[in-house]
Amino acid sequence: MKNRCFWVSESQLYIDYHDKEWGEPVYDDATLFEFLILETFQAGLSWITILNKRENFRKAFDHFDYKKIATYSDNKYESLLQDAGIIRNKLKIKSAIKNAQLFIEVQQEFGSFSKFIWSYVAEKPIVNTFHKREEVPATTLLSDKISKDLKKRGFKFVGSTVMYAYMQAVGMVNDHTTDCFKYSKK
């Protein structure tokens, strides 16, 4: 049996997410946007709640097509509020639309969102050597800095805790614990 990080439950969905996605470096803007949306909706909730609704989010939000989301009408916003398959939080839905618009602005400024976000770690994942749950932080000075920059640009639901979870999800930091089979020093 494989040793996994402490937070992985018995849920096959969680196991697959941990084994195939979490901590794997993502440089593709479409996937970076998907995780931005999912992490912002996760604020205040458990990640398994988001994973359980991920396909519903994908369907409701046009496969996380940020160009489409950036142009959502009031009617589309209202239909999202009625969609029981997603988290129906008014502020989070509005922020998804606004964040899509701002995501495009960042792309225009930097050439891609990937160039922007990965510049914070010099395009290379930070590999941590955490042994126990207590060592893994909820925020860091770097997540504080990224959060502050995104907020200054107008992004919503991008507090430091959300941004650190985002950094973990997209592989900017490798926080697999040293006893996990996915841990790597590279």
Label the model's feature ranges.
Residues 1-186:
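HhH-family (HhH-GPD) DNA N-glycosylase catalytic core used in base-excision repair
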